[in-house]
Amino acid sequence: MSTIIYPSPIFGPVHSRRLGISLGINLLPADGKVCSFDCIYCECGFNEDHRPTLPMPTRQEVAEKLEEKLKQMAADGQLPDVLTFAGNGEPTCHPHFAEIIDDTISLRNQYCPSAKVSVLSNSTMIHRPQVHDALMKVDNNILKLDTVDPIYINKVDHPNGTYDVETIIERLKAFNGHVIIQTMFMRGECKGESVDNTGEEYVAPWLEAVKQIAPQMVMIYTIDRETPAQGLQKATHEQLDAIRDKVIAAGIPCTASY
């Protein structure tokens, strides 16, 4: 098992399958993982295997390191297409997430005004007013909804604490369309149980929830790197294309990453 722990607070730039040339912003510790999910497919590994000893970067550290990197990229003539909050876990867990978003937008406007600001989140903190308001300010508010099946969520995403999918859907609807839904589709088994969510019994109710949320876009994808759990398999091109086409037929733009 090979997993990735990203530098903090800035990493890359990297080429994102979904976003282009992406400069990563990691609000989590540089030596471990902090997440409200513990997904069996996470490229950063299981939470218990990567407990951090370092603190989260401060708001000031993030701003200083981001400005330093943007100055360097400008001098090199290679500005990013997108500034992406991702990294070792859930970015909205940071206590100063909202303020860091404001700082990032200001630096973006100064150094690379054509770049987008994106946040990749698992949707668990969107009940916090300051998180919701901050996500309304970013260009790409990319929020996870892997399924609407509670058993599947607990089996695959392993949320910490209470996670009620109906409540999450209502909170996603509260963005009034300023949201991109991101969903992982995969096949295979984990601990002797199927984790295949590509079948109609999973896709149909998920699509109904997506219609209710009415996002600006849906991004579906599959496993791209090694996973901490064994026995997982990529969804096929044909499966992803079929799901994508159903979303598009519902009037919602959709991309598939293989």
Model-found features: residue ranges?
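Canonical Radical SAM [4Fe-4S] cluster-binding loop centered on the CxxxCxxC motif
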Residues: 18-61
